[in-house]
């Protein structure tokens, strides 16, 4: 399928330069390397827990206001992904790299201005919405670049950028400890945000180059198919616009089949119930550590979470390929195992099983399950619906985290403000256990959803969707009722 006119315009000069000086094999390695480096730097939003103490004590934000900012971040990260995925499939990932350049630097510049001038938290929420969208665009560019360049190794081509993205929070937590980013013993958010503004501007430009290699690869394959192996790599640019929009109708027909597949919605609902609590934990990790184990360092818990998230992303990607290739074991069983691990993690938090010096166990389990979810879900989707519409398919699934993380985050903020107290020096017991006890219901529904997605006929899947939606409505009602009762007491 030919390059679209937009993709041709964005990559024409870069393709000419790269094809003149590099072989196809070298270009693939270059693109993959740049993509992985981009992922290593892309996870600044995962450091939100390190911003929380400053927002609370210096800007005097409540936990509910902080969760509004976190919700805007999640909405910016996940809600535009269906559109970003569609644009990437039709016009190449290079378009997403351009979007990341346009959103990242202005977003962090606005955030730095808000912090410096003590503007309303709504401006900070808007800035993090832009940052969230830019993060997804940059990360999705790298993910699609690797997946489309090396489509045969599904697990590794997805787990490698996903692993680097998880590792980025570990690197970031160490970088933010530098003395130049500290002020009076606390993190200087103004300097931090300005640093990110400059970093992501140049990183987006490099990602633009790496994404252009995908266009080169597809253009070369197209010409070989049409004209044979002896067709030169460089041709008249005016010829590139002929029949350059046939990708859109072909993509549309495949995407319609994806939308009509009942398994799409079963898996989508499962994702909503799994990523929501995980994203809520990351957003509120700083406050959660303070409430449950005040003596622990937030940066250390973020680092532990990042390490085990990275190990999960790397190991599960390779393990899924190994099990499918050698033992024909479905990736869905690995996914179900990670969901069960998340179930026990919620139990441990709710019952304060590991507190004080043992809280690192909670961070490790949470990080491993979080990384596993973001590795296995896209791998399963890639395996079922293929690389042609992977951008649109995975992007459509990201509606679920946008809804789930916002819902669970708001609930946590309400419970924390009413039960824990934002400015309390210490707390007794686990004042947020209510949130995690209620989340056990969502994970239980999620396990049944994945199980029925692997087995069962079409009628069972349809009935399961209806039942699960009714349970989810009941679940939201119970949360609202319990919050109301806790405020009265």
Swiss-Prot record:
Task: List the SUPFAM superfamilies hit by this protein, alphabetically.
Answer: MFS general substrate transporter
Which CDD domains does the protein's record reference? MFS_Mch1p_like
Q: Name one GO molecular function term.
A: transmembrane transporter activity
Superkingdom of origin organism:
Eukaryota
Q: What is its main location?
A: membrane
Q: Which controlled-vocabulary keywords does the entry list?
A: Membrane, Transmembrane, Transmembrane helix, Transport, Vacuole
From the record, give the transmembrane residue ranges. Answer: 34-54, 68-88, 94-114, 124-144, 156-175, 196-216, 262-282, 302-324, 335-355, 359-379, 403-423, 463-483
Subcellular location per UniProt equals:
Vacuole membrane
Report the GO terms under cellular component: fungal-type vacuole membrane
Summarizing the function annotation, the protein's role is: Probable transporter.
The answer to whether the entry has keyword DNA repair is: no
What protein name does the entry list? Answer: Probable transporter MCH1
The membrane topology of this protein is: Multi-pass membrane protein
Q: Identify the InterPro entries for this entry.
A: MFS, MFS_trans_sf
What family does the database annotate?
Answer: Belongs to the major facilitator superfamily.
């Amino acid at each position: 399928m030919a390059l679209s006119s937009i993709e041709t315009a964005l990559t024409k000069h870069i393709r000419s330069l790269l094809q003149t000086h590099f072989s196809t094999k070298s270009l693939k390695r270059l693109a993959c390397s740049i993509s992985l480096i981009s992922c290593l730097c892309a996870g600044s939003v995962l450091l939100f827990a390190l911003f929380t103490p400053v927002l609370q004590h210096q800007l005097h934000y409540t936990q509910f206001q902080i969760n509004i900012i976190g919700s805007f971040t999640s909405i910016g990260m996940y809600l535009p992904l269906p559109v970003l995925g569609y644009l990437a499939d039709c016009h190449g990932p290079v378009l997403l790299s351009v979007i990341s350049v346009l959103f990242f630097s202005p977003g962090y510049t606005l955030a730095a201005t808000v912090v410096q001038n003590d503007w309303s938290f709504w401006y900070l929420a808007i800035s993090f919405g832009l940052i969230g969208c830019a993060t997804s665009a940059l990360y999705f560019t790298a993910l699609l670049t690797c997946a489309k360049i090396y489509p045969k190794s599904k697990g590794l081509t997805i787990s490698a950028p996903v692993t680097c993205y998880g590792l980025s929070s570990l690197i970031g937590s160490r970088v933010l400890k530098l003395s130049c980013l500290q002020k009076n013993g606390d993190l200087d958010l103004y300097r931090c945000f300005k640093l990110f503004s400059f970093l992501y501007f140049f990183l987006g430009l490099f990602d633009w180059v790496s994404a252009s290699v995908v266009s080169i690869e597809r253009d070369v394959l197209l010409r070989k198919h049409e004209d044979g192996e002896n067709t030169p790599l460089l041709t008249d640019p005016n010829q590139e616009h002929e029949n350059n929009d046939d990708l859109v109708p072909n993509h549309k027909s495949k995407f319609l089949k994806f939308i009509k597949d009942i398994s799409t919605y079963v898996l989508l609902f499962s994702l909503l119930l799994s990523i929501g609590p995980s994203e809520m934990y990351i957003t509120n990790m700083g406050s959660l550590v303070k409430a449950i184990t005040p003596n622990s360092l937030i940066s250390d818990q973020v680092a532990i979470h990042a390490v085990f998230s990275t190990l999960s992303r790397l190991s599960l990607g390779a393990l899924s390929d190994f099990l499918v290739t050698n033992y024909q074991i479905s990736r869905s069983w690995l996914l179900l195992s990670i969901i069960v691990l998340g179930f026990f993690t919620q139990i441990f938090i709710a019952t304060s099983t590991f507190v004080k010096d043992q809280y690192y166990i909670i961070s490790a389990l949470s990080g491993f399950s979080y990384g596993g979810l973001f590795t296995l879900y896209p791998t399963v989707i890639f395996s079922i619906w293929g690389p042609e519409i992977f951008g649109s398919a995975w992007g459509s699934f990201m509606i679920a985290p946008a809804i789930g993380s916002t819902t669970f985050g708001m609930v946590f903020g309400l419970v924390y403000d009413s039960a824990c107290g934002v400015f309390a020096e210490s707390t007794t017991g686990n004042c947020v256990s209510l949130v995690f006890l209620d989340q056990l219901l969502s994970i239980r529904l999620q396990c049944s959803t994945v199980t029925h997605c692997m087995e069962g006929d079409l009628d069972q899947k349809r009935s399961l969707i209806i039942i699960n939606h009714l349970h989810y409505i009941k679940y939201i009602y119970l949360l609202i009722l319990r919050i109301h009762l806790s405020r009265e007491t």
